[in-house]
Amino acid sequence: MGKLSMLYNAAIASTFVKVFLFPSYRSTDFEVHRNWLAITHSLPISEWYKSSISEWTLDYPPFFAYMECVLSWIAYFFGFDKAMLDPYNLNYVSPSTVVFQRGSVIVLELVLLFALREYVLSSNVKDQRNALLTAIDIFLSPGLLIIDHIHFQYNGFLFGLLLWSIVLAKPEKNMLLSAAIFSALICFKHIFLYVAPAYFVYLLRVYCFTPNFRPQFLNILKLGSTVISIFLLAFGPWIYMKQIPQLLSRLFPFSRGLCHAYWAPNFWALYSFVDRVAFAVLPRFGYALNQGTSINAPTRGLVGESSFAVLPNIPPALTFYICLGLQITVLIKLFIKPTWRVFVGAVTLCGWISFLFGWHVHEKAILMVILPFSILSLIDRRYLEAFRPLAVSGYLSLLPLLFTLNEAPIKYLFTGAWIAMLLTFDKCAPVPVKRVFLLNRVNIAYISGFVPLFIYNCFIHKLVMGDKFEFLPLMLLSTYAAWGIFWSFVSLLWLYFTDLK
């Protein structure tokens, strides 16, 4: 208990903050999940993925639908507002509804706390202090506070499952249970398919084959039957009802643009920024552009829209092949050297590649990179320096999700305090045996650059521009954050291939 008391105290303190935030701003995701409670409670299972009573149709895999169903019956039996369970009560909100839904996020986040506890206890004695700091760092994530406890989602629960499966993937733990939990996680939210290749290669290499590549047929049978059983448990009813095509059409809507309406800070944000600058600048130098393309067209995130004014348009297939090629490169190292740390690096990089180069990526997906990378961040100072621009850029890029004035103090103070904590970790990260030029001062200068950027976005832009160029502050933040995230990606990629063991 003693070594974990700091983690528990941090969890208790943060829970008070989260309860205090119950009345705060709620995004449309709050109504999305209320509607899913209503659908799974009031409609037969055959209608779950067919219902279009609300525009917020069920588009998560079956395990998440089952979870919403269980939550709905808990709400029903414990006397919460039953009107929230009526699918025809569109945009319904009541104090009881808010308390139940906000409270369910906090309770389910205990899975994350348990996973972090297991991570600390499974670490070597000499690494436990840093593991504890990492656990606190993850649980106090500004991203989880913003996205889950204000904006409204269940990422703490989902990433708790991911981190628990990562911890169990240590050879001395329970790799079969790790595979089972990760398979279940995919059946909760299919975005985790991005990192599935790393699990496949690692489990194949370590669990299904001996170090000299002799197949272990019993392990292959156990692994295969476990994974298949979990997917049958999730998708079995829809297989029986012959509704798999309908279910998949909800899970994978391909008619969206390359970028979300608010550009995620990835490679395509940089690409879009260059396109917009070229559109504005080239005509001044006598270059004729296609006047049929509006400056508002590039990557606004609208359905079916992904055209550019100057640069070539990007088809979905190209993003797939870029991600596939880069992930294969990462997986080759994992196949050759299948250690647990290399596995964590591969999970991080597979998620990172999908975030940087994937199609229609949401800014919230940056959690798939930051949280796994946190496990590696205190190996030594090189990893910490690679982590810092990612974490700072990623979390600051989430702040525009909260655009109401009442939430401004908490989002800036909490995120600022977390960044200040991160900047003190130099004392904890070991100095590497192989000294390299870490560009520490460059990283600090880059992070400091967010200060004038936010001053401009929050105060100067409105005074100078008025109602013109409303997209400019978001574009500047997304583009500047993308540089830091891309630089961190290159840094970890270098360490992954040259150092990680």
Curated annotation (Swiss-Prot):
Pathway field: Protein modification; protein glycosylation
Chief location: endoplasmic reticulum
GO-annotated biological processes: dolichol-linked oligosaccharide biosynthetic process; protein N-linked glycosylation
Gene Ontology MF, one: dolichyl pyrophosphate Glc1Man9GlcNAc2 alpha-1,3-glucosyltransferase activity
A GO CC term assigned to this protein in UniProt: lumenal side of endoplasmic reticulum membrane
Signal peptide limits: none
Keywords for the protein's UniProt record, in alphabetical order: Endoplasmic reticulum, Glycosyltransferase, Membrane, Transferase, Transmembrane, Transmembrane helix
Sequence ranges on the Cytoplasmic membrane side: 25-59, 117-131, 178-180, 337-341, 411-412, 465-473
Protein's UniProt keywords contain Glycosyltransferase: yes
Record localization: Endoplasmic reticulum membrane
One Pfam short name: Alg6_Alg8
Its EC number(s): 2.4.1.265
Membrane topology reported for the UniProt record: Multi-pass membrane protein
Record topology, Lumenal segments: 1-3, 81-95, 153-156, 202-315, 363-389, 434-443, 495-501
Transmembrane segment boundaries: 4-24, 60-80, 96-116, 132-152, 157-177, 181-201, 316-336, 342-362, 390-410, 413-433, 444-464, 474-494
Enzyme class, first EC level, given as a word: transferase
Catalyses which reaction(s): an alpha-D-Glc-(1->3)-alpha-D-Man-(1->2)-alpha-D-Man-(1->2)-alpha-D-Man-(1->3)-[alpha-D-Man-(1->2)-alpha-D-Man-(1->3)-[alpha-D-Man-(1->2)-alpha-D-Man-(1->6)]-alpha-D-Man-(1->6)]-beta-D-Man-(1->4)-beta-D-GlcNAc-(1->4)-alpha-D-GlcNAc-diphospho-di-trans,poly-cis-dolichol + a di-trans,poly-cis-dolichyl beta-D-glucosyl phosphate = an alpha-D-Glc-(1->3)-alpha-D-Glc-(1->3)-alpha-D-Man-(1->2)-alpha-D-Man-(1->2)-alpha-D-Man-(1->3)-[alpha-D-Man-(1->2)-alpha-D-Man-(1->3)-[alpha-D-Man-(1->2)-alpha-D-Man-(1->6)]-alpha-D-Man-(1->6)]-beta-D-Man-(1->4)-beta-D-GlcNAc-(1->4)-alpha-D-GlcNAc-diphospho-di-trans,poly-cis-dolichol + a di-trans,poly-cis-dolichyl phosphate + H(+)
Keyword Acyltransferase assigned: no
PANTHER family: DOLICHYL GLYCOSYLTRANSFERASE, DOLICHYL PYROPHOSPHATE GLC1MAN9GLCNAC2 ALPHA-1,3-GLUCOSYLTRANSFERASE-RELATED
Family: Belongs to the ALG6/ALG8 glucosyltransferase family.
Role this protein plays: Dolichyl pyrophosphate Glc1Man9GlcNAc2 alpha-1,3-glucosyltransferase that operates in the biosynthetic pathway of dolichol-linked oligosaccharides, the glycan precursors employed in protein asparagine (N)-glycosylation. The assembly of dolichol-linked oligosaccharides begins on the cytosolic side of the endoplasmic reticulum membrane and finishes in its lumen. The sequential addition of sugars to dolichol pyrophosphate produces dolichol-linked oligosaccharides containing fourteen sugars, including two GlcNAcs, nine mannoses and three glucoses.
Name the record gives this protein: Dolichyl pyrophosphate Glc1Man9GlcNAc2 alpha-1,3-glucosyltransferase
Organism expressing this protein natively: Schizosaccharomyces pombe (strain 972 / ATCC 24843)
Source taxonomy: Eukaryota, Fungi, Dikarya, Ascomycota, Taphrinomycotina
